[in-house]
């Protein structure tokens, strides 16, 4: 048995969209078959059935009503699927044989425009990426708003990932032969992004003509070839999916990555710029604090401002001056905000105009929105700052469009543009005439019903209408005996009624329905003419929408500044960040009002280049560092800042290495990720950058970590091409000595108060290094069980021991045969336990013994810290090792313990077999047997 004609047609269509779920129109339903049906039934919770199709087995099938498709499409697209819509392209009743069908649209995560599934304050970007040797280009479009941005740079994965993080596209279009390793990197970092591939030729084909046709501002000589290829590839994909050239995408905006403050992927996450670390939601982010916008357009624009802070002084100061003027004119600001509240999403409405999907109600929303523009222009004339004056000169009031919409459309039109009831009375004579005929016909129907009731005496008689039988007279069976013989023609029998018609009724029906049908056709024709006129003026409306969104952003920043007592920062060119009584903008909003402790900051590229911050965990070091970065970002956005005074130097890049970012499932340890991030910072930071480093070196052994942290500080301060402004938090108290040896290092610490064996974090950053880490106290605050805390205190007391002794004699373990004698002079090392707390080792009596791990790394470490080491050979039977320490002594027993602990920490358990794990455990147990 062969395939049925319908199934053959289905399979032919499906062949052209293998990566999509095919919605195949059959009558009033969209049907899905085979694997598509299985996926859709699971995702949409539909019943999976089957259909005979000429194969040995029934084809799996599920379906949805065509009029409810948007809801189901939205759910599938949100889950990352692509949907191909296959429609009937001819009237089934007029078709001979199988109905002609074809794909009219492909809906993908990056091309979806249904406002009910899009976040109104967030763009829905689709991105294209093109790589050519060592250069790459990227383009980003939001087809719902018409934005189209392109850039290019030398190819570095980090640069591409930063741009992806900034724009957060839902979908990325790549050349089909691009390396899978690169795709894997993207998916690993951004698992929710959909990847689509197109052929190399689609980036090249008819490139200049395509771009000229699409963009009003395109000049082929202004763009690098690689940029044009990236843009052309994205346009091809949009046309391929939308089956239409979208007129709202009419301007290409090229930007250089270095035109904005660079905030890399990790820093965006660590600083919680647009979403918090835990829930990945807006609440608790900088955007959450600053967003008091009144329009969807303004909300999207403010997000862009925050994602792309400025690095040029003039535009920053223009924004700051505008915000200041709003704060000095509160009544005018309130008038502006009140009108902004009445403005709908102009950008997305005209986007629907371009895609021919706009309805009359949305055009009424457009009319109401642009009706507010003349008032906004009037308010702008009351300001004096350059930014507002320029806006007042450039804003188009769109009065001609408002006049047309107001004259043409009913205030409350039908939702569907093919049901009539759209055009206002007086706009078109033919519409008025047909409406009168329709109205008169219905009046005649009403009078007929009243006449028949009176003449037959049947009070329940009624004249009704349905699409199957048209108009009819309905009489209940209880009153059939009252029906005059021959008065009516029987049409239909129901269980408790009879339906009749008369020649006169049918004649009037033809007039009424003819008028209705013609009226619907004419109203739809007029609507499309209005829509086409608006489409011709899309660029005018987009320019006005952008000005409105900028005004909304400035009003939002002014509102936040007023509510939170922010001040206007001074933007300087001195490479200096000076903040008096600065506050963390987010933290102060989530704790009781007035409880946040403010702090001062002074960072420059000279005497205060690297601020070395010591102090216990939970004391506020990380909050303080983030606070400085966020205040800098806010200033470069053009926002007032949470401080008493702020003098901000413009930064070109902000880097952070704060908090854990392990990826154990990918086989990456904490330390490896940390080192990768530090490496990225040291390679890419400049003297104009702001760098935040927290606990560098903590993921490895104490000695290794201290050495790395020390070396990183030296590199930052001594490298003439770097010398970036740096905040460096650490538990390695030994590093505080660097203030005396390295120019630009300054010690600061978090103030702590001790009251009755309890500690209180004062959250105040003070000059000088910390002398304790309070590790046990922090553990107690964190809720560790009392027995653990008490035992820790006992161990610490034992380690500290008797500090009056000035030397330590340690006998070597029996397993060592060395005759070396090591004497370490004053100012040797402090060591740290694995919680980061400082360990001050005790002075042991001659009866105390400890195993000395004698390896080259220990010797090298001691040597690198300029300790006096004298080695001399003695008789094997009188081996003696003496370590003389000024204020404390090192118990090498703990060095061995530390090494075992580090070995345990570095076990890659995810990649071990059970037997390997058992053997590793047995090996560790054996190593501990040597320790007393």
UniProtKB/Swiss-Prot annotation:
Disulfide bonds: none annotated. GO terms for cellular component: cytosol. Pfam families: MutS_I, MutS_II, MutS_III, MutS_IV, MutS_V. One of its GO terms (biological process) is mismatch repair. The keyword Nucleotide-binding applies. It comes from the Bacteria. Signal peptide: none annotated. Keywords: ATP-binding, DNA damage, DNA repair, DNA-binding, Nucleotide-binding. Transmembrane segments: none annotated. ATP binds at residues 615-622. One of its GO terms (molecular function) is ATP-dependent DNA damage sensor activity. Belongs to the DNA mismatch repair MutS family. This protein is involved in the repair of mismatches in DNA. It is possible that it carries out the mismatch recognition step. This protein has a weak ATPase activity. This is DNA mismatch repair protein MutS. It comes from Clostridium botulinum (strain Langeland / NCTC 10281 / Type F).
């Amino acid at each position: 048995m062969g395939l049925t004609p319908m199934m053959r047609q289905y399979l032919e269509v499906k062949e052209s969209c293998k990566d999509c779920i095919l919605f195949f129109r059959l009558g009033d339903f969209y049907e899905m078959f085979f694997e598509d049906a299985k996926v859709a039934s699971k995702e949409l919770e539909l019943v999976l059935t089957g259909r005979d199709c000429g194969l040995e087995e029934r084809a799996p099938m599920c379906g949805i009503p065509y009029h409810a498709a948007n809801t189901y499409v939205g759910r599938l697209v949100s889950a990352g699927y692509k949907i191909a819509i296959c429609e009937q392209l001819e009237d089934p009743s007029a078709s001979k044989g199988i109905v002609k069908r074809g794909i009219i649209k492909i809906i993908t995560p990056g091309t979806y425009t249904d406002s009910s599934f899009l976040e109104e304050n967030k763009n829905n970007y689709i991105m294209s990426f093109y790589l050519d040797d060592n250069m790459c280009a990227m383009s980003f479009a939001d087809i719902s708003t018409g934005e189209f941005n392109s850039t290019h740079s030398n190819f570095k994965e980090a640069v591409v990932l930063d741009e992806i993080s900034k724009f957060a596209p839902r979908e990325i279009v790549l050349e089909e032969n691009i390396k899978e390793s690169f795709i894997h990197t993207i998916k690993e970092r951004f698992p929710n992004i959909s990847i689509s591939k197109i052929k190399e030729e689609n980036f090249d084909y008819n490139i200049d003509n395509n771009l000229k046709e699409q963009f009003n501002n395109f000049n082929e000589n202004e763009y690098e070839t690689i940029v044009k290829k990236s843009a052309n590839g994205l346009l091809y994909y949009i046309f391929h999916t939308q089956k239409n050239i979208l007129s709202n995408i009419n301007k290409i905006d090229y930007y250089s990555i270095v035109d904005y403050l660079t905030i890399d992927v990790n820093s965006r996450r660590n600083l919680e710029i647009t979403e918090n670390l835990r829930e990945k939601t807006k609440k608790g982010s900088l955007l959450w604090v600053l967003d008091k916008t009144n329009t969807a357009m303004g909300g999207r624009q403010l997000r862009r401002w925050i994602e792309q802070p400025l690095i040029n002084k003039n535009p920053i100061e223009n924004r700051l001056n505008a915000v200041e003027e709003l704060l000095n004119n509160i009544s005018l600001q309130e008038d502006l905000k009140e009108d902004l509240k009445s403005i709908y999403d102009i950008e997305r409405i005209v986007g629907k105009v371009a895609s021919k999907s706009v309805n009359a109600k949305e055009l009424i929303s457009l009319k109401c929105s642009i009706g507010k523009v003349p008032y906004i222009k009037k308010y702008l004339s009351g300001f004096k700052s350059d930014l507002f004056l320029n806006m007042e000169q450039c804003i188009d009031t769109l009065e001609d469009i408002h006049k047309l919409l107001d004259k043409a459309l009913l205030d409350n039109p039908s939702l569907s543009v093919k049901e009539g009831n759209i055009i206002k009375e007086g706009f078109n004579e033919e519409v008025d005439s047909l409406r009168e005929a329709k109205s008169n016909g219905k009046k005649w129907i009403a009078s007929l019903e009243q006449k028949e009731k009176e003449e037959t005496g049947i009070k329940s008689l009624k004249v009704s209408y349905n699409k199957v039988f048209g108009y009819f007279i309905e009489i209940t069976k209880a009153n059939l005996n009252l029906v005059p013989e021959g008065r009516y023609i029987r049409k239909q029998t129901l269980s408790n009624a009879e339906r009749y018609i008369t020649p006169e009724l049918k004649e009037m029906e033809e007039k009424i329905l003819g008028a209705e049908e013609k009226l619907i056709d004419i109203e739809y024709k007029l609507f499309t003419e209005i829509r086409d006129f608006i489409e011709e003026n899309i660029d005018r409306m987009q320019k006005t929408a952008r000005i409105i969104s900028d005004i909304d952003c400035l009003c939002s920043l002014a509102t936040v500044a007023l509510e939170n007592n922010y001040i206007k920062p001074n933007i300087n060119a001195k490479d200096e960040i000076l903040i008096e009584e600065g506050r963390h903008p987010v933290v102060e909003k989530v704790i009781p009002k007035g409880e946040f402790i403010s702090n001062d900051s002074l960072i420059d590229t000279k005497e205060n280049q690297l601020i070395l911050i010591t102090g216990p965990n939970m004391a506020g070091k990380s909050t303080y560092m983030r606070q400085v970065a966020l205040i800098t970002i806010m200033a470069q956005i053009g926002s007032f800042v949470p401080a008493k005074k702020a003098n901000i130097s413009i930064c070109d890049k902000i880097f952070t290495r704060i908090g854990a970012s392990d990826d154990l499932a990918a086989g990456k340890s904490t330390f490896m990720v940390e080192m990768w991030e530090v490496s990225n910072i040291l390679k890419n930071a400049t003297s104009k950058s702001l760098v935040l480093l927290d606990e560098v070196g903590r993921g490895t052994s104490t000695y290794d970590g201290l050495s790395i942290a020390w070396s990183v500080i030296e590199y930052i301060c001594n490298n003439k091409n770097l010398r970036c402004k740096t905040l460096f938090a650490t538990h390695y108290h030994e590093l505080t000595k660097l203030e005396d040896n390295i120019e630009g290092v300054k010690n600061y610490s978090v103030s702590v108060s001790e009251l009755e064996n309890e500690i209180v974090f004062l959250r105040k950053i003070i000059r000088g290094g910390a002398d304790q880490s309070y590790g046990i106290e922090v553990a107690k605050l964190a809720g560790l069980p009392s027995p653990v805390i008490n035992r820790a205190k006992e161990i610490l007391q034992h380690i500290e021991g008797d500090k009056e002794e000035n030397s330590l004699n340690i006998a070597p373990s029996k397993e060592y045969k060395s005759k070396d004698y090591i004497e370490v002079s004053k100012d040797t090392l402090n060591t740290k336990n694995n919680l980061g707390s400082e360990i001050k080792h005790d002075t042991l009596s001659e009866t105390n013994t400890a195993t000395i791990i004698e390896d080259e790394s220990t010797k090298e470490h001691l040597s690198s810290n300029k300790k006096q080491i004298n080695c001399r050979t003695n008789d094997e039977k009188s081996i003696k090792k003496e370590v003389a320490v000024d204020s404390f002594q090192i118990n090498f027993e703990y060095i061995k313990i530390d090494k075992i602990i580090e070995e345990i920490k570095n076990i890659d358990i995810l990649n071990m077999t059970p037997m390997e794990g058992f053997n590793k455990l047995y090996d560790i147990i054996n190593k501990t047997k040597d320790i007393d």
